[in-house]
Amino acid sequence: MPRPAAHADPFLAVADPTRRAILDRLRAGDAPVAQLAANFDMTRPAVSRHLRVLRDARLVRERRGGGDGRQRIYQLTPGPLRDVARWAEQYDAFWQDGLARLKRHVERGTRRGREERER
């Protein structure tokens, strides 16, 4: 089975902290490139490259807006994140089990400490 192009993989797209921050910003609503770029210490073309990766991974959608239709407005399309979430959920049981063991260990230690103080 052929692998998708790396730039079209939602896992790789969300691996970058700048792209995750862009997705977080777009959760608040659609935004043009200029508005998104204002949130980052990088050039507008650099932000556009990040947006292209997100668009190729189908995590954002681009549409034309503004009075003359030249402005590019970006919208979050979180559907592909379901694959990422499903994969991450596999590890939830691992963490829950580990936390439950830690809780039991702490509770045993607390109980022993109380018993020793009561003697």
What are these regions (language model features)?
Residues A15-D16, T43:
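Alpha-helical hinge/cap motifs
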